[in-house]
Amino acid sequence: MHPSSRANGPAPHKPYNPFYLQLYFWVIIAIILGALLGHCYPAVGQQLKPLGDAFIKLVKMIISPVIFLTIVTGIASVAHVGTVARVFGKAMVYFLFFSTLALLLGLVVAHVVHPGAGMNINPVDLHQGEIANYVEKSHDLTLVGFLMDIIPKTLLSPFVGDNILQVLFVAVLFGIALALAGERGKPVLNLLDALTVPVFKLVQMLMKMAPIGAFGAIAFTIGKYGVDSLVNLGWLVGSFYLTSLLFVLVILGAVSWLCGFSILKLIRYLKAELLLVLGTSSSESALPSLMEKMVQAGCRKSVVGLVVPTGYSFNLDGTNIYMTLAALFIAQATNTELTPAHQLALFLVAMLSSKGAAGVSGAGFITLAATLAVVPEVPIAGMALILGVDRFMSECRSLTNFIGNAVATLVVSRWENALNHEQLKIALDGNEAAYQSLHAKDAEPSLSR
C-alpha cells in the first residue's frame, strides 16, 4: 500500500459514520414516535396503517426480481448442476435440524415455565368469531397442496404473485438451462448481470423509506391493540421473548462460534435490517437487503440466492418456537391434559404445517390452528386467548426467523467452502475504512462474482 494512502486511510471514515445519517437511527426514531402516537392518540395511530402496508408492498414489489436475478446469475456462473443440488441439500439438512430444535425448545420451555397454568379458562366462554377466518384457512394446509403450489401456472405468473418459492423454482430451472446453454447463453447472462445494478439501486432507494413504514406500522399496532393487552398475557409474551432470545444467543450463538464468527457481531452488522423487521413486523421487508449484505459479507452469490429465499419458507425458527409454546399454553390455560402421544402428534404436525403456510398472511396463527386441529382435546377456541397479543409476538417471530436465516446462509456458505473469511471479518468487525474500500468497488457488480 502506498504510504500516502495509509496515512489518509482514516479520512473517509468520518463522512460515512455519523449516527444521525444511518438508516437504523431514523428507524429507531420512527419506532419511538410511532409508539408514542399510537399510545396517546389510538384513533390516529390506527389510521396510519396504510403507511406500513404501502412500504411492505413496495418491498414485495422488488423481491421477485432480486431473487430471480441473484439465483439465475449465480447458478449460471457456477455451471455445475451438481453444485446447485449439493447446496440445496445442505441447506435443507440445516433447516430440518434447527427447525426441530426450535420446536423442542418451545415444548421444553412450556413445560418448565407453565405460562398458562392457573388461568382456568372455559373454552365455551371464549369469543370464537375473530379466529374463524384463521381456522378456515388452516383447513387448506396440506403437504401435497403446498408442494403442488410451488409449480406456477405459467413461466411468468410467479412475478405477478407473492409466492417466493415459485420464483425460486423458476429461477433455479432458468439458471440451470442458462448454464447448459454454454457460450450461446452468455449474452443473456451478461444482460441479467447488468440488470442487477439498477435493481439493487432501487432496493437502496426503497430502504430510505423504511422509517416512514416503521412509523405507520408501530403506530397502528399500539393504537389498535394497546400496551394494556400485554398485561394479562404478559407471562406468555415474556416466555416467548426469552425463549427466542435463548435460541438466538445460545443455540445460534454456539453454531456461529463453531463456524468462526460472533452472533452478536452479526446482529450488529444487520441492525438496520433488524430494526426494519421490528418496525414492520415482517421479515420479508428486509429480504432484499439481507441478500445484498450476505454477499457483501463474503458469501458466494449462488449460495445466498438459494439459501435465503428457501429459508424464508423452510427455516422459520421463531414461528416453530411460537407454535409449540402457544399450543401448550392454550392446553394449560384450559386445563387440558396432553399425553406424550398428543404432544408427539403436535410436534410432528407443527414441523409440516410451518412449511405449508409460507407466504400466507397471518401464517403464525394459521399454522397454529392447523396444528391444534390434529389434537381434538385442545380447543381451537383457545386461540382467542392469544389473539390480542399475537401482534406483539409477531415481531419476535419475524426477528428470530430473520436472524436464523442470516446464520443459515453463513453456515451453509462455510460448509460449501463458499465464504470469504477476510471479507466476513471486515464486515462484522465494522472496519469502516476497509469496508468502504471494499464497498467502493460497487456492491451491485460484486453480486455477480
Swiss-Prot record:
Gene3D superfamilies: Sodium:dicarboxylate symporter. Disulfide bonds: none annotated. GO terms for molecular function: fumarate transmembrane transporter activity; malate:proton symporter activity; succinate transmembrane transporter activity. One of its GO terms (biological process) is L-aspartate transmembrane transport. It is found in: Cell inner membrane. Pfam families: SDF. Keywords: Cell inner membrane, Cell membrane, Membrane, Symport, Transmembrane, Transmembrane helix, Transport. GO terms for cellular component: plasma membrane. It is a multi-pass membrane protein. Its main location: membrane. The chain crosses the membrane at residues 18-38, 61-81, 93-113, 159-179, 202-222, 244-264, 311-331, 369-389. It comes from the Bacteria. InterPro entries: C4_dicarb_transport, Na-dicarboxylate_symporter, Na-dicarboxylate_symporter_CS, Na:dicarbo_symporter_sf. HAMAP family: C4_dicarb_transport. PANTHER family: AEROBIC C4-DICARBOXYLATE TRANSPORT PROTEIN, PROTON/GLUTAMATE-ASPARTATE SYMPORTER. Responsible for the transport of dicarboxylates such as succinate, fumarate, and malate from the periplasm across the membrane. Belongs to the dicarboxylate/amino acid:cation symporter (DAACS) (TC 2.A.23) family. This is C4-dicarboxylate transport protein. The gene is dctA.
